[in-house]
Regions:
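Conserved ATP-binding subdomain of kinase catalytic cores across diverse folds
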Residues: 43-159
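Regulatory N- and C-terminal appendages and interdomain linkers associated
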Residues: 1-42
Length: 160
């Protein structure tokens, strides 16, 4: 998606070297500038596979990692991979299902058009340019306490 915002899909201004409009950044990340994702897609895929094997993953069937802002970096903010308690969930590309992050993001956009409430979500680039899906977690309070919520796996009576 060249020259389009990875949050709203609308065109970016001519010559802009960013992936989001400032207002879209605030909606997704809570900042006017997108945080840096300092990992390559292959590094994250290897980490996600390791996390799935160790069974310390966010529930669901896709490989995913929990992210939060690196408290040591100020401007621009940087993401770091954390345990289960991060404020964001990142879903990388998978070999089995090409373009799954893009499909999930466009599905969420279609849900919004149908007036279905969704979590803040968008696409993001790894340091090598490959796209991944990112969403802000809404199943935790600001203090990290779990909020009761159902996801599609639970609705389909699939164990996660």
């Amino acid at each position: 998606m060249k020259n389009r915002c990875l949050y709203c899909y609308e065109p970016l201004s001519e010559g802009e070297r960013v992936d989001y409009h400032a207002k879209c950044c605030r909606k997704l990340f809570g900042t006017s500038q997108a945080p840096i994702l300092p990992y390559t897609s292959s590094e994250v895929r290897a980490l996600a596979d390791e996390v799935v094997r160790s069974q310390t993953t966010v529930t669901g069937v896709q490989p995913k990692l929990s992210l939060d802002f690196d408290q040591m970096s100020n401007s621009p903010k940087r993401f770091t991979i954390v345990g289960l308690w991060g404020r964001f969930i990142l879903k990388p590309q998978t070999e089995r299902y090409p373009h799954l992050p893009e499909l999930e993001d466009v599905s969420m956009h279609l849900a919004e058009i149908a007036k279905i409430e969704t979590v803040p979500h968008g696409l993001m680039r790894f340091s090598d340019g490959e796209l991944c899906y990112i969403t802000r977690r809404i199943d935790r309070t600001g203090q990290g306490e779990k909020l009761p919520m159902e996801d599609m796996c639970q609705l389909s009576e699939r164990l996660t």
